[in-house]
Amino acid sequence: MNPRDLACSALLFAAATGIPSAPAFAALPAAVAGTPLPTLAPMIRKVSPAVVNITTRGVSSQSGAHDPLREDPFYNRFFHSPPGQGPEEQPFASAGSGVIVDARDGYILTNAHVVDHARAITVTLEDGRNLKARLVGIDTPTDIAVVQVDARGLTQIHLGDSSRLAVGDFVVAIGNPFGLPHTVTSGIVSGLKRSGFSPDDFENYIQTDASINPGNSGGALVNLRGDLVGINTAILSGSGDNIGIGFAIPVDTAASVMRQLIEYGAVDRGQLGVAVYAVTAEVAHSLGLAKATGGLIAQVSPGSPAGKAGLRAGDVITAVAGHPVASNVDLRDALGFLRVGDEVTIDLLRNGRAERRRAVLADTLAPAPDGAAGGPHARLHP
């Protein structure tokens, strides 16, 4: 028997007879041995008390036979159930999440669709306390709402800067999916300025692959420092299953709406009085523009702020209040958080020449031709 055959025979014998061999131990790679493993636990411990569970009860108009899924506002918003035989008043109980943004005064940010039509709102803190909440204000176009509780010992989250986010940044979602309290999932920023899901809404979503499910609505999307960068609001799915495409409202948008809701109880949007189309490559070529950018004015309301400022159909708006307008979505969002009476500068191109105009926003409604995106001035919503 050659040495190789002898070695094989010895191995077979050992396996068959159960002769003990030297124990094997899992070992850490040399690069991490003796050093702490990376963990998000300290950040989560800091942020988690600022995330709350929100349960609501109310009555809404429903169609057709009773379906428990249709009592979930998240489901109804994104996975519309089949139409039934007619509307009827239906009591509902639903759940979502929220984020404490002001510990002193008890203000909590959440989604509008979490508290819409609610007659009773209950906030459950991480420490188990159940608190009655009142609705401060709701803004359906941005899907943002603010509720308030009267309590001591609250923990508020630190507001970050969503304009500094970049694709590839790590983010963490915290909420109460399916009633599982303070569930934490992680991922990255998969995309920015996502829009086009609804022609009637303000859309400037952060896209993330951090898992978002029913009950996460209104919860926190934070960066690795624990700063709030978004309010989780939706997923993209044909079946209702999470496929790794979730969306959050940027905190810059949420904070702007929040301030107006707290101060005024509603968002008083200034109107410009124009309807615009996106500048496509074909439109840019026909207008002699170097690139497809800006919002092409399709129509101006007579007597509107735009009309008084001298804007005309065919003008291309390139900036509002110093903010570049690369698309009609940018224009809509730029105007969407300005108030009645605000004066804004409008940079535009007319016959290939750059001009600047000033307009004082009013509450004038804009025309909305078929296919046009009129922006907030045409009462488009998120």
Feature map (PLM): residue ranges:
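Conserved catalytic motifs of ABC-family nucleotide-binding domains
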Residues: 314
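C-terminal segment of classical bacterial N-terminal signal peptides
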Residues: 15-25
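Serine-dependent protease modules
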Residues: 25-309, 319-345, 349-356, 360-381
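Sec-dependent N-terminal signal peptides
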Residues: 2-17
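Protein maturation boundaries and topogenic segments
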Residues: 1-2, 298
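N-terminal leader/targeting signatures
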Residues: 9, 21, 74-75
